[in-house]
């Protein structure tokens, strides 16, 4: 037993496993809250119901793999049977194709139906908003989830869906747990220390927007999991397999194709190895995207579909969504994703507040600067900073690695002030301070910047050129790159605490880390849907 405990204590992944278990427990604690679709879940859950009922998908603008995870959850949690059940009721009047919104509908027996149920009549989904058993009437919201408002001649059978939130969201929660594991493995394959990797993974796991989105029945969740799998396989050197994962990411949601940009940039900057295997990655991604598309489309379309025609349909549908023709408060240009800090409510009570944790969002720009500094150490003598200062210089950074040099314009050069707290010489000129280091380039810094470029910076010229509408939740796959930078930075502060014997700098470093982590958890507690579940009236009031 002692030997087992000793091995467990030395096992690298014990804290990662604990983190995954905690996150899964929190997700499953609220997976059924609310028991109705939240935000864009409505589109994908409705489409899953359409597919299950034997009809062709209504959301042809998206690839099908992400939808199949929702469909699979419905089947598994309904005993591998369709959750669509005949109610015993039929329609008692004509329904016109021009009558949308809420309307009264006479049925054969209203007592068989309940308020809040989703029903399907032919191919049209409706939500029951009220019932009147005495008059055998129900009030329905027509065209639910974008299904076509159609003409219905009585009597038509009314079916109700018996699926629930657990079946819709189950695979999103499982895939999000897999994403946490993959993210940690990515950090380790970037030569980050165990501590830095765990810090980054902790920050990502309890980042509000990531947690919120990871528990929703959305296509982006499965797409991100395959993206992270592609990154991990690439960093391990499994190039062809990485290309297949990129294809699967794009088959879940087209945005997943951006993963190949991050991989290509990193390979060109850092690796440039095994060129033919890397060419295999670049070739496998589009080839498997096309080859696997008919398989993923077969059930949603209930037949074989030409993948090239599907691709053209998706691209045309995407191109038609521009800022010029899409209204509402949700569309935002990419620059607003990181500089607009307002909350976007998806649902109230429990509150689904779509906002990147401020502990992360406020530091996006500083973290990018830090990552750039770490990434640019491409040679053994990298000039970390060049700052022009007045003639008096106080060397308050004496413990930084490297040497501090005070260099004057020619002919005087190389006046060295290394490792001293003395005031700089009284000279009348302006000097240049340089910190000379011996670090090589930092692979994690470079990869995080490539990741950020592919999933965020790409959208800036794309929107400028095409006017393609974008939404703030498009930042979801980018957050991991920022957490890598935060993990690296905080690990350096912890190391500074360890190497310093005493002094204010020692305790300041560890205080920054502790305060930040507590603030990060506090924001998560106050903003996540979990607050409503465990927090009582105080936290509910704070969120209202």
Regions found by a protein language model. Give the residues of each.
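Transmembrane-helix motifs of polytopic, lipid-linked glycan transferases
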Residues: 21, 166-191, 198, 229, ...
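Transmembrane helical bundles and short interhelical boundary loops of multi-pass, membrane-embedded
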Residues: 281, 321, 389, 393, ...
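Autoprocessing Asn-cyclization modules and mimics
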Residues: 82-153
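Specific aromatic-rich, kink-prone transmembrane helix
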Residues: 222-241, 245, 481-485
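Transmembrane-lumen/periplasm boundary regions of multi-pass, lipid-linked membrane glycan transferases
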Residues: 267-368, 373, 377-381, 415-418, ...
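Short helix- or helix-capping micro-motifs
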Residues: 20-23, 200-205, 232, 246, ...
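Perimembrane helix-loop-helix junctions
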Residues: 1-5, 235-236, 241-242, 246, ...
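Short acidic/glycine- and proline-prone juxtamembrane loop motifs at membrane-interface regions
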Residues: 38-39, 209-220
């Amino acid at each position: 037993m002692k030997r087992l405990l000793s091995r467990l204590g030395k096992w690298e992944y014990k804290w990662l496993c604990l983190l995954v278990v905690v996150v899964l427990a929190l997700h499953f604690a609220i997976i059924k809250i609310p028991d109705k679709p939240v935000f864009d879940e409505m589109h994908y859950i409705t489409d899953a119901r359409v597919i299950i009922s034997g009809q062709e998908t209504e959301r042809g603008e998206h690839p099908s793999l992400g939808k199949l995870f929702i469909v699979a959850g419905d089947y598994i949690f309904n005993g591998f049977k369709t959750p669509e059940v005949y109610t015993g009721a039929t329609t008692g009047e004509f329904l016109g194709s021009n009558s949308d919104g809420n309307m009264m509908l006479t049925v054969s027996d209203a007592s068989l139906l309940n308020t809040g149920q989703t029903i399907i009549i032919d191919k049209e989904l409706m939500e029951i908003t009220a019932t009147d058993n005495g008059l055998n009437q129900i009030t329905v919201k027509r065209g639910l989830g974008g299904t076509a408002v159609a003409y219905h001649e009585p009597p038509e059978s009314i079916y109700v869906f018996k699926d629930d939130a657990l079946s819709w969201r189950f695979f999103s929660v499982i895939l999000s747990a897999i994403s946490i594991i993959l993210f940690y493995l990515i950090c380790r394959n970037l030569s980050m220390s165990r501590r830095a990797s765990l810090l980054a993974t902790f920050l990502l796991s309890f980042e509000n927007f990531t947690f919120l989105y990871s528990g929703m029945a959305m296509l982006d969740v499965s797409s991100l999991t395959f993206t992270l799998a592609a990154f991990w396989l690439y960093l391990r050197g499994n190039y062809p397999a990485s290309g297949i994962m990129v294809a699967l990411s794009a088959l879940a949601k087209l945005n997943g194709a951006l993963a190949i940009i991050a991989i290509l940039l990193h390979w060109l900057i850092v690796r440039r190895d095994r060129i033919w295997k890397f060419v295999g990655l670049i070739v496998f991604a589009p080839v498997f995207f096309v080859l696997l598309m008919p398989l993923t489309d077969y059930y949603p379309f209930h037949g074989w579909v030409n993948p090239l025609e599907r691709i053209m349909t998706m691209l045309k549908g995407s191109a038609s969504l521009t800022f010029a023709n899409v209204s509402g408060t949700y569309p935002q240009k990419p620059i607003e994703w990181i500089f607009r800090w307002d909350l976007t409510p998806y649902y109230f009570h429990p509150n689904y507040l779509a906002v990147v944790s401020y502990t992360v969002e406020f530091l996006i720009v500083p973290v990018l600067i830090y990552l750039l500094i770490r990434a640019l150490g491409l040679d053994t003598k990298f000039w970390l900073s060049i700052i022009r200062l007045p003639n008096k210089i106080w060397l308050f950074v004496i413990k930084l690695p490297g040497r501090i040099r005070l260099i004057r314009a020619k002919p005087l050069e190389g006046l060295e002030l290394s490792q001293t707290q003395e005031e700089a010489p009284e000279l009348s000129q302006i000097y240049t301070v340089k910190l000379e280091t011996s670090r090589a380039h930092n692979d994690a810094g470079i990869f995080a910047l490539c990741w950020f470029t592919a999933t965020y910076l790409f959208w800036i010229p794309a929107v400028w050129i095409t006017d393609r509408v974008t939404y703030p939740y498009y930042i979801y796959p980018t957050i991991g790159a920022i957490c890598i930078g935060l993990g690296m930075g905080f690990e350096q502060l912890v190391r500074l605490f360890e190497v310093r014997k005493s002094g204010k700098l020692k305790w300041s470093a560890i205080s920054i880390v502790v305060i930040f982590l507590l603030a990060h958890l506090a924001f998560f507690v106050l903003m996540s849907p979990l607050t409503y579940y465990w927090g009582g009236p105080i936290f509910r009031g704070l969120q209202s």
